[in-house]
Amino acid sequence: MASKGILKNGGKPPTAPSSAAPTVVFGRRTDSGRFISYSRDDLDSEISSVDFQDYHVHIPMTPDNQPMDPAAGDEQQYVSSSLFTGGFNSVTRAHVMEKQASSARATVSACMVQGCGSKIMRNGRGADILPCECDFKICVDCFTDAVKGGGGVCPGCKEPYKHAEWEEVVSASNHDAINRALSLPHGHGHGPKMERRLSLVKQNGGAPGEFDHNRWLFETKGTYGYGNAIWPEDDGVAGHPKELMSKPWRPLTRKLRIQAAVISPYRLLVLIRLVALGLFLMWRIKHQNEDAIWLWGMSIVCELWFALSWVLDQLPKLCPINRATDLSVLKDKFETPTPSNPTGKSDLPGIDIFVSTADPEKEPVLVTANTILSILAADYPVDKLACYVSDDGGALLTFEAMAEAASFANLWVPFCRKHEIEPRNPDSYFNLKRDPFKNKVKGDFVKDRRRVKREYDEFKVRVNGLPDAIRRRSDAYHAREEIQAMNLQREKMKAGGDEQQLEPIKIPKATWMADGTHWPGTWLQASPEHARGDHAGIIQVMLKPPSPSPSSSGGDMEKRVDLSGVDTRLPMLVYVSREKRPGYDHNKKAGAMNALVRASAIMSNGPFILNLDCDHYVYNSKAFREGMCFMMDRGGDRLCYVQFPQRFEGIDPSDRYANHNTVFFDVNMRALDGLQGPVYVGTGCLFRRIALYGFDPPRSKDHTTPWSCCLPRRRRTRSQPQPQEEEEETMALRMDMDGAMNMASFPKKFGNSSFLIDSIPVAEFQGRPLADHPSVKNGRPPGALTIPRETLDASIVAEAISVVSCWYEEKTEWGTRVGWIYGSVTEDVVTGYRMHNRGWKSVYCVTHRDAFRGTAPINLTDRLHQVLRWATGSVEIFFSRNNALFASSKMKVLQRIAYLNVGIYPFTSVFLIVYCFLPALSLFSGQFIVQTLNVTFLTYLLIITITLCLLAMLEIKWSGIALEEWWRNEQFWLIGGTSAHLAAVLQGLLKVIAGIEISFTLTSKQLGDDVDDEFAELYAVKWTSLMIPPLTIIMINLVAIAVGFSRTIYSTIPQWSKLLGGVFFSFWVLAHLYPFAKGLMGRRGRTPTIVYVWSGLVAITISLLWIAIKPPSAQANSQLGGSFSFP
């Protein structure tokens, strides 16, 4: 690994074990100072073989780090064993990793005929020869017996061989690559690079890059289902496809409407409460409290705002729905042998999974490693998965932890596949409280589990010991470097005859890797070019792309785990740390995600992207398939993303601070699913890549804009003009009338990477659903994705280095209209809003078994800071162009109201705090918000309260949440509204008015100090200024209740109605703030003294201030029977 600070001045590393050799260069400097990556042809022609020398780096053994793997090609082996670095100020370089010697040899394919086991047939290049399309492996002798004595029938699929002679089989094998190449459309021209990529681009010349449908129909030997122009006659299938004729077409998903007995009363109650609120507010405005007009005025303003807030929150809930998937149909369509896919290879599209981390101190690397292991073990075609780890901190600790995880995955992933383990996060699995042996029928499960558990414990010890190991290693190398420098200085002085005292030598304390070279990322002690905001870009392929065919190994005597018949392949795993330099805005998480989008487009180009936080792991191994059911179903090409609910572990049983947030995830999100789709919540979301690129959805001109799900829909006619602002907002990236993309403007939008631009039409085509039904208007032929992916070569990874550099996004539309959107701390909501604003739809996928699980802060202070960040992002959205008031006509009205509520809800805190002080002011003054508690007021109040309770009961009914969860949400709504939301409004206003930027720190995911208590963090009290407003409300209301009782008891004419009104109001406030007060109590002896000091000072100050403003009269003093008076 190398960076600018390591290999400048001729590419010599700063170590002295041996003479350094020049590294492999993949770019050149332009006149402007930028570095442009060489193409593959440039590498072959311009760089001599002398330049290709090795720079050795030692890394831990991984499944890919095996020496001289004969199964891998030279290019792929070179890429998987090299680490690439580069950036704005350094040439892109590849550095070959030093391999550790291993006695393990690659497994040689054996004949699959029972009782044989000989080596299978191979051609002159050493590639396997498979004479049948079913890929049944057979040796020469068995093949001869099958042809001569078996009637020419394959022993595997029982179908006749097409080639019965050995020469014909060899000839067919030599042309296998050509036949496979014809199974997908190609661009014609632009050299070898374009020949390797599927192109749907229509150039100005017409023929180059044009989609040749005739080539699909006449030059291929596959078939794409019933209805083709030509039905192949030589595939062993005669007549019509029996499977398609016997099996009716079935959808992959179903929409489950809420029962009319529940949803109809729900909508009726909403209408009743809306009318009651209107009548109540009109009555309140007409009947003023002349004795306390100021109290009446404050209350009526707050109530008007609360009514508006309730309407904005309630209207999008009118159309809730549920959805269900059918995984058996997905398997039948994409993984079952058909005439178009006779081998039954998976025809599912690829998925690129993004895992983001930034600080290994606050986000433990062991948590991230467990998340990676759960992804690698997911139940999805191995060759269709690619996992990218974004280390925005550039830490060596994260890099080495990922290498350890890749090594342990070689045992963990096959173990999960063999015994169908759930969940596939090893830490969660081994800590299950249920019986781990339930429903396990294989006799060797106990032995395998015991062995894997021992290996995992050793894995944890190694990962937990990495920080100390890196620190000790760095100290040792630094000491050696200082000694060498001092010796060199002495030699120079002796040679020159100078006997002066040695000068102190200052050498920057670097972070060293295991081979004795500098780490190109962030050092433990920051220095120029090696700090969090200043380091080179790094890409390391931890696990190379797997082979297209399943591979298995026999019993491993060393590990004593029998993996016979188990697919031992692992998905591709890539470590990425984007380049950071001073003077460039890194745009936090959104910038890191966009860097991964570009790098993954070049290296794997999965048409779908799943992003996960480092602490959210795959709890349901079939979750990827569940999401793919929606994307591949009829009409799925108009879906921009599939959002999964967030579920959390490690929450206290009472869920004191509403961390589960079930009201949002099970009520609001299900309701939005009935409109245009749920909002994007930052993790657990499966994206369509071209939607992130800023494309309009297919058939965007035929979109509808209903006012609600209950009213009839009106289709927009083509004669109606598009608004100008809508055209500017949605980017003119839509498909032309002939179905081809206009790519002339792509470099201005996506940058100057030709690799990236070439990958866009490929991702669009591969993301289409199957054209297996007449209603599928934008489908692809079945069997089009059964060919293996391209192998990685050095030029591809070098190009990936260039697109993660700090300068690449300059003068492009990344972050403004393409990818994750910049400008808000809640980039997730803004990104989802932009997609919906272009007319895309999204769906909410609630699986029977939770798809993903993560952690949430159970500490009060951490929870408040989390809510503060969310609310601040909402304020930023409200004051930006992403305000839903400026949404295009492609967004549905109720969806627009939902997004408008996202930006408005923090402002409710201003009115909420005022309203929480009103009962105290009533008790202090002896007045109430109304003149008298008459029957009309009480009737309105009763109707509003009863309808609210009934609506809550019906929401609980159709969403499936518990009553306690609903009440916890109500409590924390007031806690957050009187603390974090108010601070968010103030910070947002400061940013808009004064331009003061807002900075947030990551929420710590470390466990508490008390390791014996799972919920130790729950009781820890950490003081923050956010606690002052709710603490003040509690103390003032308690004092006001005491004052109100005293005044009423000693009054000659007690006004019990006003006292009861004020006391009831105060108890309502205090009941909502009870979890906050309980959190301040902590455990005995743990509550900070400052809490008591602030409580007393605030209560005394407010009381004295009130008395100074309105001192008691002499008559009141005489009634109280006391002669004491304030000065």
UniProtKB/Swiss-Prot annotation:
It comes from the Eukaryota. The keyword Cell membrane does not apply. GO terms for biological process: cell wall organization; cellulose biosynthetic process; plant-type primary cell wall biogenesis. Specifically expressed in root hair cells. Its EC number is 2.4.1.-. Pfam families: Cellulose_synt, zf-RING_4. Induction: Down-regulated by 1-N-naphthylphthalamic acid (NPA), an auxin efflux inhibitor. Residues 1-24 are annotated as: Disordered. It is a multi-pass membrane protein. Keywords: Cell wall biogenesis/degradation, Glycosyltransferase, Golgi apparatus, Membrane, Transferase, Transmembrane, Transmembrane helix. Disruption phenotype: Plants develop short elongated root hair with kinks and swellings along their length. The active site is at residues 392, 828. Gene3D superfamilies: Spore Coat Polysaccharide Biosynthesis Protein SpsA, Chain A, Zinc/RING finger domain, C3HC4 (zinc finger). GO terms for molecular function: cellulose synthase (UDP-forming) activity. The chain crosses the membrane at residues 262-282, 292-312, 910-930, 936-956, 982-1002, 1025-1045, 1059-1079, 1089-1109. It is found in: Golgi apparatus membrane. GO terms for cellular component: Golgi membrane; plasma membrane. Thought to be a Golgi-localized beta-glycan synthase that polymerize the backbones of noncellulosic polysaccharides (hemicelluloses) of plant cell wall. Required for synthesis of a cell wall polysaccharide essential for root hair elongation, but not initiation. May be the functional ortholog of Arabidopsis CSLD3/KOJAK. Belongs to the glycosyltransferase 2 family. Plant cellulose synthase-like D subfamily. This is Cellulose synthase-like protein D1. The lineage of its organism: Eukaryota, Viridiplantae, Streptophyta, Embryophyta, Tracheophyta. The gene is CSLD1.
